[in-house]
Amino acid sequence: MRSRSFLVLVAVFLICETLVAQRLDRIRGPKGQGQDPVEGQDQDEGPGPVKVEILDIGQDPVKGQDPVKGQDPVKGQDPVKGQDLVKSQDPVKAELPDIGQDVVKGHEPVEGQDPVNAQLPDKVQDPVKAQPAVPGRFLLSKRGHCPRILFRCPLSNPSNKCWRDYDCPGVKKCCEGFCGKDCLYPK
């Protein structure tokens, strides 16, 4: 890449970064609490600061509507159907079974065995390492040597038809050909 095009990319990046920073400053409002802007500084005429409300847990916001004091967001509907939550009870923990209770009905845990570790096999095997290696196949080199190629194709990245000698049928070897690696008869 030329240095001129690199400088253009850097300049575009810096311009985009300053535009994003200006946009964030408009959204956030002035920095500090109650400070007046510095004299001589232009005020951005854009949307004012975004109003963010922190909701209590269990309160569902409805888009475009503010909750009315004294009313539930949905009339006549409890937050959890058929259950009244106790004030000290967490709704997530309320669904978990007791410590002594078995999660799977009809099955009792085996004594002295962790239920999570009981599901794992004794020896975890890698499927690639479990397969026996083919003896001598990857190191196999066919007899002879590759012929000399006088001309090369003008492509900068030619396609290869083979990678190693065993990719080629019969007595052919994988050699550098006219345009990339190809299966050729050896000398």
UniProtKB/Swiss-Prot annotation:
Disulfide bonds: 146-175, 153-179, 162-174, 168-183
GO molecular function: serine-type endopeptidase inhibitor activity
The record's account of how the chain is modified after translation: The short form (AA 127-187) may be an artifact due to the strongly acidic conditions of the duodenum. The pro-SPAI form may be the native form.
Xref: Gene3D superfamilies: Elafin-like (4.10.75.10)
Each Sequence repeat, start to end: 34-39, 40-45, 46-51, 58-63, 64-69, 70-75, 76-81, 82-87, 88-93, 100-105, 106-111, 112-117, 118-123, 124-129
Domain WAP positions: 139-187
Pfam families xrefs: Cementoin, WAP
Tissue: Small intestine > large intestine. The plasma contains the pro-SPAI form circulating.
Stretch forming the signal peptide: 1-21
Prodomain residues: 22-126
Known role: Inhibits Na(+),K(+) ATPase by the competitive mode against Na(+).
Name of this protein: Sodium/potassium ATPase inhibitor SPAI-2
